[in-house]
């Protein structure tokens, strides 16, 4: 299933690439970093980090953005320590709306990501010792969201965005802020 999902993502990207290249401005236009408040399903909120790149436009007003994001949450209740970690690698498409003020660029987007999940639980039972269980899983996720991007100066942009990630058993809502740095092209 994991290989099939990865194959479908790559195939769709390659099939659409030839048409898109004719009208696109693809290349590394900017790189950036973000910080987030992430609220995973059935867990308290936590802090997340991410990096991203602006690959330009594949069509008028449609930008392409690869992302790598990370968050981790640990809890200790009644002698049971548990933690869940998510590292996601994904690709998002963003539609930039035409507005009267070109300094503020609102967008809505969607994307796919592969989530590498790791869970661990440790319980200490008096007289019996410590028991630990771990589990790893890889899942495909769908991201839906939007936000704004605005120039700080000629080389740097600020962005604020909200994304909802639909990932089996680990849906998550994230509010992110980030800075991107434009590369010389």
Predicted features by range, described:
Residues 1-27, 184-185:
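Cleavable N-terminal export/targeting peptides
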Residues 22-44, 100-102, 114-139, 184:
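Outer-membrane pore/translocation modules
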Residues 65-67, 90-92, 105-111, 159-163, ...:
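Outer-envelope exported proteins of Gram-negative bacteria
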Residues 93, 171-185:
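Outer-membrane beta-barrel "beta-signal"
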Residues 127-167, 178:
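A charged, solvent-exposed segment within the mature domains of Sec-exported extracytoplasmic proteins
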């Amino acid at each position: 299933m994991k290989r099939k999902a990865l194959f479908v993502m790559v195939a769709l990207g390659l099939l659409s690439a030839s048409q898109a290249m004719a009208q696109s401005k693809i290349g590394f236009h900017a790189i950036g970093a973000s910080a987030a408040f992430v609220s995973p399903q059935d867990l308290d909120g936590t802090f997340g980090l991410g990096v991203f790149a602006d690959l330009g436009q594949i069509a008028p007003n449609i930008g392409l953005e690869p992302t790598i994001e990370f968050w981790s949450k640990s809890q200790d209740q009644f002698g049971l320590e548990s933690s869940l970690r998510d590292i996601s690698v994904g690709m998002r498409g963003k539609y930039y709306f035409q507005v009267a003020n070109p300094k503020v660029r609102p967008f809505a987007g969607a994307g796919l990501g592969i989530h590498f999940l790791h869970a661990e639980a440790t319980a200490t039972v008096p007289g019996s010792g410590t028991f630990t269980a771990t589990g790893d899983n890889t899942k495909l996720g769908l991201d839906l969201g939007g936000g704004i991007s605005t120039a700080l100066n000629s080389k740097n942009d600020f962005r604020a965005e909200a994304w909802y990630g639909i990932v089996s058993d680990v849906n998550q809502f994230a509010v992110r802020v980030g800075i991107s740095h434009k590369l010389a092209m």
